[in-house]
Amino acid sequence: MSDFLSTILEEKKREVEQRKRTISEEFLEERSASAMERRSLCRALATPGRRGINIIAEVKRGSPSRGVMNPGLDAAQFARRYESCGAAAVSVLTDAGFFHGKAGDLRSARAAVKIPVLRKDFIVSRYQIFESAVMGADAVLLIVRAISPELLGECLRLCRRIGLDALVEVHSAEELDAASEAGAVLIGMNNRDLSTFTTDIRTSIQLVRRMRPGQVAVSESGIRCREQIDRLLDAGIWNFLIGESLVTAPEPEAVLAHLFGAYAA
């Protein structure tokens, strides 16, 4: 694990412990049982959409490598624009310390659209699973590199219990095997190496060959043009998580139109 990722995870653990002192896990668990009806991310991605592909479009204010990219971002407005362009789902960064995200962004985005909304954060505790449900998320991101196999399995079971989908992120064959053993269905193949922050879509092309029947592949990070999508489609991948190129573009609609390309209806 890279030193930088370790720094993020240690800070996240401190954040969670601090929040627990304000709102107990028991309270969140009770609230999660009566949270709003979920929209299924798994169902939205199980087959190619009418454009031939599915895009999870991301609401993202910043990143450690780029700093603040869109300080005035209106999460609800971006989510509506994404949905109107044919996005299958919306991903919302809620990490404040490193990605400048806000929990309020997820709530605003969820209220603005009818498609599933994924909470993208660094999950290090079951507390955050209940928190995500209460926040209004339809799905959460679980990063294999960030948690133990035991916690991964526990979080997946908990997600199933309270009706959340889980996108389980991997970057290597070993991580994919761990995700599969834990029972993951939605597999997010991160083309970005969290140790070096370089991206290479060949990561997804190599990993999809190891996936088990019934699993659903999502290619994440570094996807900026239709040619890359064509290569990934040839490998059998039709789901793509797109973030930075959308929130930094003057017209996200134009970027999405380019990515959908000839697949537009």
Swiss-Prot record:
<keyword id="KW-0456">Lyase</keyword>
<dbReference type="InterPro" id="IPR013785">
    <property type="entry name" value="Aldolase_TIM"/>
</dbReference>
<dbReference type="GO" id="GO:0000162">
    <property type="term" value="P:L-tryptophan biosynthetic process"/>
</dbReference>
<keyword id="KW-0822">Tryptophan biosynthesis</keyword>
<dbReference type="InterPro" id="IPR045186">
    <property type="entry name" value="Indole-3-glycerol_P_synth"/>
</dbReference>
<keyword id="KW-0028">Amino-acid biosynthesis</keyword>
<keyword id="KW-0057">Aromatic amino acid biosynthesis</keyword>
<dbReference type="InterPro" id="IPR013798">
    <property type="entry name" value="Indole-3-glycerol_P_synth_dom"/>
</dbReference>
<dbReference type="Pfam" id="PF00218">
    <property type="entry name" value="IGPS"/>
</dbReference>
<keyword id="KW-0210">Decarboxylase</keyword>
<dbReference type="GO" id="GO:0004425">
    <property type="term" value="F:indole-3-glycerol-phosphate synthase activity"/>
</dbReference>
<dbReference type="GO" id="GO:0004640">
    <property type="term" value="F:phosphoribosylanthranilate isomerase activity"/>
</dbReference>
<comment type="pathway">
    <text>Amino-acid biosynthesis; L-tryptophan biosynthesis; L-tryptophan from chorismate: step 4/5.</text>
</comment>
<comment type="similarity">
    <text>Belongs to the TrpC family.</text>
</comment>
<dbReference type="InterPro" id="IPR011060">
    <property type="entry name" value="RibuloseP-bd_barrel"/>
</dbReference>
<protein>
    <recommendedName>
        <fullName>Indole-3-glycerol phosphate synthase</fullName>
        <ecNumber>4.1.1.48</ecNumber>
    </recommendedName>
</protein>
